[in-house]
Every structure is written in C-alpha cells, then in structure tokens.
C-alpha cells in the first residue's frame, strides 16, 4: 500500500481525492487544504470541498495559511508518507517537503507546457481554444515545470464555461491519475520533460480583466463571458454601476460597441466591435443574478435601444 499526503482545495481536487479514497492501493495519511474562508454575500465561513470530504472520511486535515516554515509542515513531514498528490492546492510546496518523499505528482488542468499557473481553464476558454486537458506531472520547485507523466484532452464546446469544464476535467484528471499512477510507481512509465520554450502562463485573473471590452468581436466577448462564469464573473457598467453578465448568446446585428441594438420583453441585444450578443443571465448591482426576462420586466424596463453599456 502506498502512503499518500493529498493536497488540494476546490471541488476539482475533491473529485481527485475521492478517486484515490476508493482505491485500496492507497492509504491517505492526511489532507492539506486552504484555510476556511468567508464566502458569498453573507461572508459565511466555509470549509473547502476537500476538507469536507476529508472529514467525512475521518482523515487528519492541515490548513496552513502558508505551508513553508509552518508547524504544519513539520507535522506533515513527520507522517512518513511515500508520496504526495496535489490537485489545485493553491500554494507552492517547499523544497524540503518535496525532498522528504519518494515522489510528488500534480494533476494540472491544462495540456502542459501550455497554461502553467492558477487559471488554466479560464484562459483556455477566453482564448477560444478548441480543447482543454489535464497533465499528470512531477512536482518541482518551479511552477508547473516538472516532467510530464501523462496527459489527456477533451473538446471545449460553445455551451461550456469554467464551471462545466472544471467538472469535466476533474473527472478526466481523476481517471488519468488512477490509470497512470501504478505504472509510474512501478517504473514502467517514464516521465517526459516539457519543452520549456513553448511554455505559456495563466496567472490568476485581475479585477481589470473581469471587465468586458465591447470593442472586441462578439465571439471574443462571448468567450470572455464563458471564461469568467461562474467565477469571477465578467462585468460591464450600467448607469455607472457594475453589471455582471453570466451568460450570453451570439446574435446578429451591428452598432457602436456596447450599444443596445434590440430590446423586447424577452431579449436584450448588445453590439460588439463586430457582431452582437444577446444577454441571457445577468446580475445588476445589489441584486441576485436573474434571467434576462426578469431583468427586463423589472429594473431593466427603462433601458432603450441606443443606450450604451460600459459607460
């Protein structure tokens, strides 16, 4: 039996952890995840999905604010694990920890060396990529630069957003890890170095990147909206206030960038630099998200063709 420390935070990670827990070949000694955080409009203190799953299986849980130099690090190393598996953990692993185990592998949600960093799925959708994937890789000190053990891909559909792709890639990553790990540990599967000259990066998105640029072609704005849903959510301005847009559809029509070019009781069409978008799920400032029909029957009733979003 291989003794493991698992490190991860969101539901993506919990899906991978669940797969390991169902395999008798692996003994999960402990789980390391991010601290509980205030979440949502009510700022409720919330456990990470990985912590919830770990507690359900009565596993020890460590939640260091910063792993390096912490007492938790010493306690984790004292467990004597054979290896570490990480998936969207959200922190760098200290070299001393990597050196203390026989192996350390990561389930990364991109086709490396493309999209190293913390937001690979967001960037894949925003950039209009036709496919996304996962890579099982060895952990090294440099971010997502380790040798690749295996990879798998799937298509990105127009109906996909970050949330749906996270769910799909979590399952893909779980299955790939469980398929790959035995051959890797036996030495039958040899890792392959990345071509570092081809590396691209996907750093966490800034607040400025959440704002839509209506001067871009409609397809790019459409991709941007999907690449921000369900978090951090793309927005524009409506009467000077933040107006979040969760979902939209490509539409025909033209006009000045951000201009409302059609309005009915059920639709609101906005021009982009080329083409247009019909908004379908929105969130006005201070309100919950709502279908466009509800918005147009309420506070959006006063909008008129010719009004401009983004100002």
From Swiss-Prot:
Membrane-spanning intervals of the chain: none
Top-level EC class: transferase
Family recorded in the similarity comment: Belongs to the Fmt family.
InterPro entries from the UniProt entry: Fmt, Formyl_trans_C, Formyl_trans_C_sf, Formyl_transf_N, Formyl_transf_N_sf, Formyl_transferase-like_C_sf, GART_AS, Met-tRNA-FMT_C
Catalytic activity: L-methionyl-tRNA(fMet) + (6R)-10-formyltetrahydrofolate = N-formyl-L-methionyl-tRNA(fMet) + (6S)-5,6,7,8-tetrahydrofolate + H(+)
Origin: domain of life: Bacteria
Organism the protein comes from: Streptococcus equi subsp. equi (strain 4047)
Protein name as it appears in the record: Methionyl-tRNA formyltransferase
EC identifiers of the protein: 2.1.2.9
Function text: Attaches a formyl group to the free amino group of methionyl-tRNA(fMet). The formyl group appears to play a dual role in the initiator identity of N-formylmethionyl-tRNA by promoting its recognition by IF2 and preventing the misappropriation of this tRNA by the elongation apparatus.
PROSITE patterns in the cross-refs: GART
């Amino acid at each position: 039996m291989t003794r493991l420390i698992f490190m991860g935070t969101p539901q993506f990670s919990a899906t991978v952890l669940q797969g390991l827990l169902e395999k008798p070949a692996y003994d999960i000694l402990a789980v390391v995840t991010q601290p509980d955080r205030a979440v949502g409009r009510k700022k409720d203190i919330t456990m990470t999905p990985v912590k919830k799953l770990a507690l359900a299986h009565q596993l020890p849980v460590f939640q260091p604010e910063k792993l390096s130099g912490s007492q938790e690090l010493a306690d984790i190393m004292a467990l004597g694990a054979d290896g570490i598996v990480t998936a969207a953990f959200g922190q760098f692993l200290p070299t001393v920890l990597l050196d203390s185990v026989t192996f350390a592998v990561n389930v990364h949600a991109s086709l490396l060396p493309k999209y190293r960093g913390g937001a690979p799925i967001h960037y894949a959708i925003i950039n209009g990529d036709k496919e996304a994937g996962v890579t099982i890789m060895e952990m090294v000190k440099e971010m997502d630069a380790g040798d690749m053990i295996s990879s798998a891909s799937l298509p990105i559909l127009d109906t996909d957003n970050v949330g749906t792709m996270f769910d799909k890639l979590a399952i893909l990553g779980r299955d790939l890890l469980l398929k790959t790990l035995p051959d890797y540990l036996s030495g039958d599967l040899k890792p392959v170095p990345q071509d570092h000259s081809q590396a691209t990066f996907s750093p966490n998105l800034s607040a400025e990147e959440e704002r839509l640029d209506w001067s871009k072609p409609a397809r790019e704005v459409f991709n941007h909206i999907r690449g921000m849903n369900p978090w951090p959510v793309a927005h524009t301005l409506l009467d000077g206030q933040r107006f979040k847009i969760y979902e939209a559809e490509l539409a025909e029509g033209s006009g000045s960038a951000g201009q409302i070019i059609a309005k009915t009781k059920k639709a609101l069409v906005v021009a982009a630099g080329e083409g247009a978008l019909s908004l379908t799920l929105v969130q006005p400032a201070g309100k919950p998200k709502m279908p466009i029909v509800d918005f147009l029957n309420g506070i959006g009733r006063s909008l008129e063709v010719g009004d401009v979003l983004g100002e």
